[in-house]
Amino acid sequence: MKKEPQSIVFDKYADNYDEGHTQAVKASGFLPSYFHEYKVIELFTYLKSIGKEKEKLLLLNYGCGTGNSEKYLKKYLPNLIICSVDISKESIRVAKEENKDLNDVTFKQFDGLHIPFEFEFDIIFIANVFHHIPRGQQFDSMKAIYNKLKASGFLIMYELNPVNPLTLWVAIQNDYKFDKNSKLLNPLYCRKLLNKSCFKKCMIRFTIFFPGFLSFLKRFEKYLYKLPIGAHYYYIAKKC
């Protein structure tokens, strides 16, 4: 049976995406908002470490879905100019409605490859997107991302870690609507994808080591970032 295009799958569930996501991550003990916000906090922490957290930077949110990251991006990094794209027309509709009060935020539908902006970006933010992209299309997508970065720019790319038992259990048990055709990406594969696309200085960090009922241990997570068993991981990769 031919797989349904992901754009159509996400169109169908755009209005109920948050409900489905809540069910999918229930075993973690956290709400989806926790995961949306933590990713932005990681970006903020990195920008602060290089003294750029207050700069007026151009950010592309590649695969923005229903726009759950934008309010946190503007909360922690209010000077950002945000351009957000997604393959799902209905998800973009929901994202525009949910974020209509935010300034300097633009949403556009795209085909997954041709990024619909003429200018280049300081940051490209990719939150758990690439495991939805068919393997045969991932290199072309990553190369398109590379070509849209300024020479001084970087991407921050988050993925689910298939080595983590809770992540794997959630993926197997939930097999939920918009994720059933995806394939989790191991960190080594992602590094090879980035290197093949000409990215340099790839830095990896592992995150989310404790479920909700052990959240009092969260303060220790910053010391565990090298352990390859976190539920999520992310790469920061530079163009040069």
Which role fits each region the language model picked out?
Residues 1-25:
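N-terminal, positively charged/glycine-rich alpha-helical extensions of SAM-dependent methyltransferases
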Residues 183-198:
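Short alpha-helix
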Residues 162-180:
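Short, glycine-/aromatic-enriched active-site segment of Class I SAM-dependent methyltransferases
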Residues 35-55, 72:
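Conserved alpha-helix/loop element of class I SAM-dependent methyltransferases that forms part
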Residues 139-151:
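A short glycine-rich, Lys/Arg-flanked "PGG" loop and its adjoining helix->strand segment in the class I
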Residues 60, 66-113:
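Class I SAM-dependent methyltransferase SAM/SAH-binding core
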Residues 125:
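A conserved beta-strand element that flanks and buttresses the S-adenosyl-L-methionine
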Residues 152-159:
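Conserved beta-strand signature within the Rossmann-like core of class I S-adenosyl-L-methionine
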